Regions:
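Left-handed beta-helix
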Residues: 90, 98-265
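Unchanged
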Residues: 1-149, 257-263
Length: 265
């Protein structure tokens, strides 16, 4: 609280760290100001079968929230919180202090803080977000989000929009070497790689080496991985700095409609 107080902000944006999306926060802030809200929560409609994974809210026609429950066992709505909030700082500060002083509180944002603000009659509004959004809190959803970057018309497109910057801690690396004998289709290859094998529908992160005769399909390869000749990787996530030895087989294929079980190394 002291850190934020030194900037004396009127509003504070609270975000989750395991979600993938692109959003213009300025547009959400304009909505927040227009509705004279104390708190605005980004929402989207989810299937009822998945609603128990999210904070679920009921809203009036004007978008105001009159009910909020974190991960309900029996959800009464499909309006799911995306973990993106804008608060009046004075309001958030008050309830954070009160929550910390409450010995019965679990100190949980969704279970305690948001319901407390709502119960005291403050103005909470839902801001509907239509774009791509994915919670990558599971292995399968992390794999799916990476696969969504691929293809001619990807579900999550990193290109084609001016002004969108990607901030990362990657070191500056040389251009990748893509050997003439390599076979690559529908893949994303970052800088600093040496590619001699076959890669299909996969993400190859910085500094990776794929030797001649190695096969990578439908997989996510984290930075600085070396995949030796003859290794076969399918439907897998390989952690950074791994070495996949010659002839190793990781993962497999799935029948249509079969649940995808992603291998992890």
């Amino acid at each position: 609280i002291g850190f934020i107080d030194q900037y004396q902000p009127e509003y504070v944006v609270i975000l989750s760290g395991d979600h993938i999306y692109k959003m213009d926060y300025a547009a959400m802030l304009r909505y927040h100001e227009q509705m004279e809200a104390d708190c605005t929560i980004a929402v989207r409609t989810v299937p009822l079968a998945e609603a128990s994974r999210f904070g679920i809210m009921n809203t009036r026609e004007d978008g105001s929230i009159y009910e909020f429950e974190e991960k309900p066992k029996h959800p009464t709505s499909t309006n799911a919180s995306l973990g993106i909030y804008i608060f009046k700082w004075s309001v958030l500060k008050k309830f954070l202090i009160e929550d910390e002083e409450n010995p019965r509180s679990e100190n949980d944002f969704g279970k305690n803080v948001i319901p407390a603000i709502l119960n005291e009659g403050y103005r909470l509004f839902a801001y509907e977000f239509q774009g791509y959004w994915k919670d990558v809190g599971t292995i399968s959803s992390l794999w799916e989000a990476n696969m969504d970057l691929l293809g001619k018309n990807p579900a999550f497109n990193l290109y084609g929009e001016k002004g969108n910057r990607i901030y990362a801690r990657n070191y500056a690396m040389p251009s990748s070497i893509i050997a003439r004998e390599s076979k690559n289709k529908n893949c994303f290859i970052a800088e600093g790689c040496e590619i001699y094998g076959t890669i299909t529908h996969s993400i190859i992160s910085t500094g990776c080496t794929v030797d001649s005769g190695a096969i990578v399909e439908d997989s996510v390869i984290m930075p600085n991985v070396h995949i030796e000749s003859g290794a076969i990787i399918r439907h897998a996530i390989i952690g950074e700095d791994c070495r996949i030895c010659r002839g190793a087989v990781i993962g497999g294929s799935f029948a249509p409609g079969e649940e995808k079980k992603i291998s992890v190394v």
